[in-house]
Amino acid sequence: MAIPNRKVVITAYGPPSTALQFVTEDLPPPPKDHVQVKILYAGFAGADVNMRLGVYPMQSAPPFTPGYCFAGRVSVNGPGSGKFEPGTLVTALTKYDSDAEYINIPEKYLLAIPDGVDPKVAAALPVDWSTAYGMVHRAAKVSEGQRVFIHGISGAVGQAVMYLSLLQGATVYGTASERNHAALKEAGAHPYLYTNKDWIAAMKDLGGVHAVFDALGFESFDESYSILTPKERSVVVAYGNNLSNLTGAKRRSPWIPMAKLLFKNLYFWSNKGAIFYFITRDQKTFEPELQLLLNMTRDGIITPPIKAVWEFDDIKEAHEAWCKGSGMGSPVIRIARDA
């Protein structure tokens, strides 16, 4: 039997007030090998903001429902599905469709949330922490004694990169708003203001860093490359083009700066390199790494901070508040009133 499903739809690119609309449509029963899940919390990331603006790489055209990931409870199993009993808490990466009360999703993409893990914390793991884990452990291969620099160190992915790099024994530097510096220092990082460029000279005086994690893009890529150490293997790990979100500048195409950065890999004589990092749920590393993060959360090895919990009805305000306000961690959207 079909059920009514309230969801957000991006009807056109633009500001939250006009781009985001609530609609209610019938959701059919889950098809073969699918599971219907009642969504409790949806993750909220820069990708959602950039999709609303129409600048996310290779995104769908409107109309579509945003929401990159979720934590929820199994409602109904479709034919051929039975791995999860109804009522089981699960999480998944979806890219679309998580800003909705219910979702039909292939069973193979669901992971059970371990006992003791808060669902809203689990909702932050598939995007923010999975991205960070892959960048730290596979893209940059951060190890003990290395120096790491993170743009936006107090942001959702930035703080995850910080904690995971500290666990590896690295020394962590990065840019952040001054209001977050005390918390970052307490966590073990060395923050700099993002409103000036003092960090460039400071990192060069240290002999450069082994890894830079850059979600800003454009001119920031050149600055990041300039602070890499030339003496050992070092890398810029680029994972976004969010500079305009911070500065309010006119939107530009990110493709030329991205190509320019990756072109530097042709300098075969150099120890410096560059990677543009992204995740998909079909990568063979995605499921085991997300499972590891769920287990690390359960075991208290990591404690992913939640910056804000927005009510579903207030999702437009969540978009307006992106990159604003104090605090560290991942914002999430409470979809279910009884979550």
UniProtKB/Swiss-Prot annotation:
Alphabetized InterPro entries for the sequence: ADH-like_C, ADH-like_N, GroES-like_sf, NAD(P)-bd_dom_sf, PKS_ER, Zn-ADH-like_protein
Listed SMART domains: PKS_ER
A single MF term (Gene Ontology): oxidoreductase activity
Any one GO cellular component localisation term in the record: mitochondrion
Induction: During mycoparasitism.
Cysteine-cysteine disulfides: none
Gene3D superfamilies recorded: Medium-chain alcohol dehydrogenases, catalytic domain, NAD(P)-binding Rossmann-like Domain
Xref: Pfam families: ADH_N, ADH_zinc_N
Top-level taxonomic group: Eukaryota
Cross-referenced PANTHER family: QUINONE OXIDOREDUCTASE-LIKE PROTEIN 2 (PTHR43677:SF4), SHORT-CHAIN DEHYDROGENASE/REDUCTASE (PTHR43677)
Name listed for the protein in its UniProt record: Protein indc11
Lineage of the species this protein comes from: Eukaryota, Fungi, Dikarya, Ascomycota, Pezizomycotina
Gene: indc11
